[in-house]
Amino acid sequence: MSKTIAINAGSSSLKWQLYQMPEEKVLAQGIIERIGLTDSISTVKYDGKKEEHILDIPDHTEAVKRLLNDLIHFGIIDTYDEITGVGHRIVAGGEYFKESVVVDDKVVEQVEELAALAPLHNPGAAAGIRAFRKILPDITSVCVFDTSFHTTMQKHTYLYPIPQKYYTDYKVRKYGAHGTSHKYVAEEAAKMLGRPLDELKLITAHVGNGVSITANYHGQSVDTSMGFTPLAGPMMGTRSGDIDPAIIPYLIAQDPELKDAADVVNMLNKQSGLGGVSGISSDMRDIEAGLQANNPDAVLAYNIFIDRIKKFIGQYFAVLNGADALVFTAGMGENAPLMRQDVVNGLSWFGMEIDPEKNVFGYRGDISTAASKVKVLVISTDEELCIARDVERLKKTVSS
């Protein structure tokens, strides 16, 4: 039986999940954090057990070695030969990649070239790819792109209203992100509703530390909130989301700590959003604790967060000319009932109504009332499974 690893590598972390395929059975999962530091943390979960170790992991190559050694050490696999495929989540595929691809040297180079579109993600992903190809050179490696699902957007949707030379010369356009998640939950929503996906109009809300909203028409992405980079859209955990671009040169002129545009963009990516406004945390659980304590900064951050999400959902009702369902997914989308309640209550004009008894922590499924004209669903995303499936599919093309 073949085993496939789904990888989500960042600049200082490597998250993984091992599947037995084609049964789609999760055998183990884990994460290696703080790569590049002497107190890196490796966590492995398998058979109801959890192993955690602190050690020195200087780079992604050593992280991959540690991961593979752990799989052997804990008896999860007997030999590396059992692993027949590795799938890598890539945030930005630009216009190079409209679907998942088998990795070769050119693919790795293109992923690195696209780092400007996802500076927090693509460099780490490329490092992860190179590490696996070095250590397991004979297995099939596949790249699965967050942007691929959004390549169905029409030109009038993905182009920005700036001179077209910036698109033709520099490929400045909306690319979107979280596409693997949006695709998966839309397919699951169709099953839940008992209707063909190609008959549905859905708004999918991926609300985690990163937040993106997508308008899905008959199974295809027709608009999405993330843009040229994952910085665009609603307010997020540490990202600002959409702001007036004229703020950037203004801040450079006013704040001596912000020396150039890169400094401002770094601030917008890493020091803004819920964490930046509240001064407390980027974690919604901490923000909700602040609400309970009547912390004014927590209240302000929460209100901005809800307001921005509602506005994007409202936009996509207009884009789709109505919707059959609103789908919440990802960390906050699945586990923050107060957030879901306040978003939906602010959109009641569209005919949505939440059942408070179903809108509780841990519930999955239809949380709307019987009278709700638009269904409200909570669906757990499974990007890793989507990656593993694409590896299995593309392995057949390599062997044929």
UniProtKB/Swiss-Prot annotation:
Binding annotation for substrate: 89
A GO term from the CC aspect: cytoplasm
Residues of the active site: 146
Site (Transition state stabilizer): 178, 239
Function field: Catalyzes the formation of acetyl phosphate from acetate and ATP. Can also catalyze the reverse reaction.
Quaternary structure annotation from Swiss-Prot or TrEMBL: Homodimer.
Family: Belongs to the acetokinase family.
Protein name: Acetate kinase
Organism: Streptococcus equi subsp. zooepidemicus (strain MGCS10565)
Lineage: Bacteria, Bacillati, Bacillota, Bacilli, Lactobacillales
